[in-house]
UniProtKB/Swiss-Prot annotation:
Originating organism: Buchnera aphidicola subsp. Baizongia pistaciae (strain Bp)
GO CC terms: cytosolic large ribosomal subunit
UniProt function note: This protein binds to the 23S rRNA, and is important in its secondary structure. It is located near the subunit interface in the base of the L7/L12 stalk, and near the tRNA binding site of the peptidyltransferase center.
Protein name from the UniProt record: Large ribosomal subunit protein uL6
Subunit architecture: Part of the 50S ribosomal subunit.
InterPro entries assigned: Ribosomal_uL6-like, Ribosomal_uL6-like_a/b-dom_sf, Ribosomal_uL6_a/b-dom, Ribosomal_uL6_bac-type, Ribosomal_uL6_CS
GO biological process: cytoplasmic translation
Gene Ontology MF terms: rRNA binding; structural constituent of ribosome
UniProt family annotation: Belongs to the universal ribosomal protein uL6 family.
Length: 179
């Protein structure tokens, strides 16, 4: 049995949760998120809590899915109340990022051309400087995916450390080959 699935989620007062079959709809001050829960998971609303369990009590996979569903719904509640963000930093001579419009990023990353990145719906970018941005949104998975996509354009290389990296990422710089 999943230890995570056994813990109920306390629903905050400013969040409303609607259960329609296996669909969970979470509404909060920052927006609304929907997620379809696996068929082997039973979700119940008891007082001001959400309780997750397996439909088949002896099924190990059902309890594993219940733990996953509980974590996903908990992330949805956190997203619509507080939100998620990832901070990215650029290291390198001439590496710049600028916000063209509310949905476009222009990146100069040492290539012969400027890279344009169109932001998906629900993602917002805030520029701290030309070398630092913050990716914000209510969907944890989407914020992480956009940050990973931006980082993939120029990953930090191990010899000089140039590239895009997360703010908390530590890049170990290798020593150059000696003759």
């Amino acid at each position: 049995m999943s230890r995570i699935a056994k813990q109920p989620i306390v629903i905050p007062s400013d969040v409303s949760i609607t259960l329609i079959g296996q669909m969970v709809i979470v509404k909060g001050s920052k927006g609304e998120l929907k997620r379809l829960i696996h068929d082997s998971v039973l979700v119940k609303s008891v007082k001001s809590c959400l309780v997750f369990s397996s439909r088949i009590n002896s099924s190990v996979k059902g309890w594993a899915q219940a733990g996953t569903a509980r974590s996903l719904v908990n992330s949805m509640i956190h997203g619509v109340t507080v939100g998620f963000f990832k901070k990215l930093k650029l290291f390198g001579v001439g590496y710049r990022i600028s916000i063209n419009s509310s949905k476009n990023l222009n990146m100069s990353l040492g290539y012969s051309h400027i890279i344009e990145y169109v932001l998906p719906f629900g993602i917002f970018v805030e520029s701290i400087s030309q070398a630092e941005i913050i990716v914000k949104g209510i969907n944890k998975q989407l914020v992480g995916q956009v940050a990973a996509n931006l980082r993939a354009y120029r990953k930090s290389e191990p010899y000089k450390g140039k590239g895009i990296r997360y703010s908390n990422e530590i890049v170990r710089v290798k020593e150059a080959k000696k003759k």
